């Protein structure tokens, strides 16, 4: 939705953040995901206000009309998830100070409490302390005509980032040709699953971890079956578990007490494990393929879920499904080889048990600069590269994607940067890494599949660059798919020889 233009004209913004996800929202302020879900269940419209969001806030983000965060950039958790849901989000609003425990926020000296009404504009980052009427957009038949023209012209595939059947259906409605990124971690945060993943993390032995993972297997398999049933024979790329494990552990005293009672584990043991898993820089720590190396049983469970789901849907529906399993955060070919061996061994067991086989692909995200620089070696094991340009930009620039919103704003104002590199790919620097990886990857494996799944996949300038670099597809949030289709057509026309 957008704001009613007449009402918007009379309103004055009290703060301005980053326009992280377009649209408009108006509602009562809530400061926790649980409060957002409870209020929405009572029919209230709410805006979720957080210092910053994490995967455990997902239910509240779904329930809210919009999201406002005091910290975070254009590729922060709040921004990426909100864009994926087509939900309004203003991120990195430094004028807002959040006091979650007191259920209030302070904006330039003025206090706002839970239940006060605000309006936020994700298109320009404005925050208002009054209610502004929202208007739902309408699509005319002309939209379909233009999209058909674009599809007739373009030579670049367009996929969507989708984590569940609902998002997958939305993606298909917008014309996506497959799923370029399914983030499996989002599936773990539902109420009946989070205790099981926490039990696995708190386990003291491999056998205990395997027991906890066995409880998660049916849920993961069901999730993947749902995706395959919606997508049919279209490609689906599923990323193995990526975030550090500490993100799944309880943060509040109440949650720690509940977990302690549920599993008969002392509060001290839970707190000790939380301290053990604490990292000073978790985004460069124990995450991605490093989890699959140290805890191969996690990759085994996820591989079994992916392949068993595909086998069952192929048998039930008669579809020819070719799963694409993506290993995240690879920086060394030996890491990928280790995890790929785990995947292949698990696949053999799955096929023997099912009495049937199917083809599958194993590839990796190119998101660490070293992976781009050694892409010739990594292509020995990877059947596809998908460029994770959010992290590649973060590591290439040395910019934290969650903490540099204000710095980037200053740099743009001072003429140091032309655009936010997290919104539009830096073609001179990060683009060089992408180009180098494509060229050296093709030297090793001429038929390697190349795509991009970072948020840059919905940016027109980046799409043209990726087309010229020789990628086969881009992937973006479902609501950005029409823009990507149009931009792909424009890139094809502009670069005709």
Model-predicted segments: where are they?
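Acidic, glycine-rich flexible loop/linker segments
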Residues: 1-36, 40-46, 50-182, 186-200
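Conserved alpha/beta-domain cores
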Residues: 139, 149-497
């Amino acid at each position: 939705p957008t704001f009613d233009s007449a009402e918007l004209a009379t309103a004055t913004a009290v703060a301005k953040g980053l326009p992280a996800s377009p649209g408009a929202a108006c509602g009562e302020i809530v400061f926790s995901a649980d409060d957002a879900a409870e209020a929405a269940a009572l029919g209230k419209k709410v805006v979720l206000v957080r210092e910053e969001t994490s995967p455990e806030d997902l239910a509240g983000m779904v329930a809210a009309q919009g999201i406002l965060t005091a910290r975070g950039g254009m590729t922060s958790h709040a921004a990426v998830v909100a864009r994926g849901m087509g939900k309004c989000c203003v991120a990195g609003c430094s004028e807002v100070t959040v006091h979650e425990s007191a259920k209030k926020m302070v904006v330039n000296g003025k206090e706002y409490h839970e239940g006060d009404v605000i309006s936020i504009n994700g298109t320009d980052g404005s925050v208002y302390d009054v209610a502004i009427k929202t208007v739902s957009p309408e699509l005319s038949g002309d939209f379909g005509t233009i999209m058909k023209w674009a599809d007739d012209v373009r030579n670049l595939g367009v996929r969507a980032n989708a984590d569940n059947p609902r998002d997958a259906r939305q993606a298909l409605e917008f014309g996506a040709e497959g799923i370029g990124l399914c983030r499996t971690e989002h599936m773990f945060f539902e109420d009946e699953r989070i205790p099981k993943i926490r039990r696995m993390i708190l386990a003291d032995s491999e056998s205990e971890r395997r027991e906890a993972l066995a409880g998660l297997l049916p849920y993961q398999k069901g999730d993947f079956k749902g995706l395959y049933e919606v997508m049919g024979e279209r490609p689906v790329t599923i990323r193995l578990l990526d975030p550090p494990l500490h993100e799944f552990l309880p943060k509040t005293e109440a949650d720690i007490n509940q977990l302690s009672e549920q599993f008969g584990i002392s509060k001290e043991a839970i707190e000790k494990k939380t301290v053990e898993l604490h990292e000073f820089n978790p985004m460069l720590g124990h995450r991605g393929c490093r989890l699959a190396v140290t805890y191969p049983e996690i990759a085994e469970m996820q591989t079994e879920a992916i392949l068993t789901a595909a086998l069952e849907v192929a048998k039930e529906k008669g579809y020819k499904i070719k799963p694409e399993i993506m290993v995240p955060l690879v920086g060394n070919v030996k890491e990928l080889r280790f995890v790929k061996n785990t995947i292949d061994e698990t696949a053999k067991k799955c096929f023997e048990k099912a009495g049937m086989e199917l083809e599958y692909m194993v590839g990796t995200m190119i998101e660490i600069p070293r992976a781009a620089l050694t892409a010739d070696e990594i292509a020995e094991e990877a059947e596809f590269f998908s460029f994770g340009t959010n992290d590649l930009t973060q590591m290439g620039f040395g910019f934290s994607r969650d903490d540099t919103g204000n710095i980037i704003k200053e740099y743009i104002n001072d003429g140091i940067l032309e655009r936010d590199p997290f919104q539009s790919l830096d073609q001179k620097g990060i683009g060089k890494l992408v180009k180098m990886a494509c060229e050296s990857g093709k030297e090793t494996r001429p038929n390697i599949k190349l795509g991009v799944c970072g948020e840059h996949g919905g940016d027109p300038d980046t799409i043209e660059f990726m087309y010229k670099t020789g990628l086969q597809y881009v992937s973006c949030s479902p609501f950005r798919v029409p823009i990507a289709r149009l931009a792909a057509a424009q890139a094809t026309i502009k670069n005709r020889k």
